[in-house]
Amino acid sequence: MSHSVLKVPPSVIERMQSHYGPDITSLSVQGAVFQAKPQGCTITAYRSGKVLFQGKNAEKEAERWTADAETPAPKKPASKKSIPSVYQPPEGIGSMSVIGSDEVGTGDYFGPITVACVYADKAKLPLLKELGVKDSKNLKDPQIVQIARDLIKTVPYSLLVLRNEKYNEMQEKGMSQGKMKALLHNQAIGNLLKKLDGTRPEAILIDQFAEPAVYFKHLAGKTAVKERTYFSTKAEGIHLSVAAASIIARYSFLMEMDKLSKQAGITLPKGAGPLVDEAGAKLIKKHGEDALRVFTKLHFANTQKAKRIASKR
C-alpha cells in the first residue's frame, strides 16, 4: 500500500481538518487530531505535526500539502501525469485572458458552499496585482473583504451560493459533494460566459477537486462547458483569475457566515474542529436539533459530536 508522511505546523493541521471535513471519521486514533478518508486514501494527522497518508491516492493527497510541509515528502520517481494532457494548463497560461473558478466552504460544517468564477483579461492582470490579488490562503479575512469589494467593481464575475437547506436536501437524495461542486462550477462558468456576450476567453481554469473524467461524468445530462477547459491543483498560483475567484468566493462565504451567526444568536466558527462541535451543541440547546438543517452540513461527523455534547448539558 502506498504511503507518504509529512511534518506540518499546527496551522496547516487546522486547514487540513477544514479541507477534509466531509471525510473525517468518528474513529478515535491515539495521539491523532483527526482521521479522514477521502476517496482512495486514509489520512491521519497527529498532535506531533506528522500527517500519514495511506492508500492508492496517498501521494496525490500528500502533494496538496507539500508546499506547507516542514519536511517535504521524498520526491517520487517520474511517472505519467495523472491529468490527461488535453486538460493540463497550456504553457504561458499565466499571461492569457482566462476564466478562473474556485470554491469555498466545502470543509466547513457551518455555512454554505460558495463558487465564484472571474474573467481576467490579460490587459487587467497588472491591475489585479495592484489590488493585492494572490493566493487567498495568504490573506486574512479583513484583506479578503477589502480586495473582494474592489474586485467586484473591476472584473466580470459570477457567484453561486449553495445554502445549507438545499445542500442537505441534495445530499440526502444521494448526491455527493463532488457532484454538487461540479454542477456549481459548470453553472457559474456558463453564467459568466453569457455575461461576456461573445468575448471568448483563451482558457478556462478550474481549481481541481476531481479528475477531469470524474468532473465531466458528474455533468452527464447537462450542457457542460468543455472547450479550452483545464484543471490544476493550486491553480491560484497559476493564474490570477483563479486567485480572484477564490477571494470573491471566500468573501461571499464570510458574509453568509455573518448572517447565519446573527440568525443563530451565537458566533459560528469556520472549519470542522472541536470549537465547531461546541457551537453545534449551543445551537441545539438554543434552537433545537432541527435548526442544524438550516445552519450546517448535516452529514459531517460534527452533527453526532454536537448532539452528544448537547445531551450532557
Swiss-Prot record:
A divalent metal cation binds at D102, E103, D207. It is found in: Cytoplasm. Its cofactor is Mn(2+); Mg(2+). It is an enzyme of class 3 (hydrolase). It catalyses: Endonucleolytic cleavage to 5'-phosphomonoester. SUPFAM superfamilies: Ribonuclease H-like. One of its GO terms (molecular function) is magnesium ion binding. Manganese or magnesium. Binds 1 divalent metal ion per monomer in the absence of substrate. May bind a second metal ion after substrate binding. Endonuclease that specifically degrades the RNA of RNA-DNA hybrids. This is Ribonuclease HIII. It comes from Bacillus licheniformis (strain ATCC 14580 / DSM 13 / JCM 2505 / CCUG 7422 / NBRC 12200 / NCIMB 9375 / NCTC 10341 / NRRL NRS-1264 / Gibson 46). The gene is rnhC.
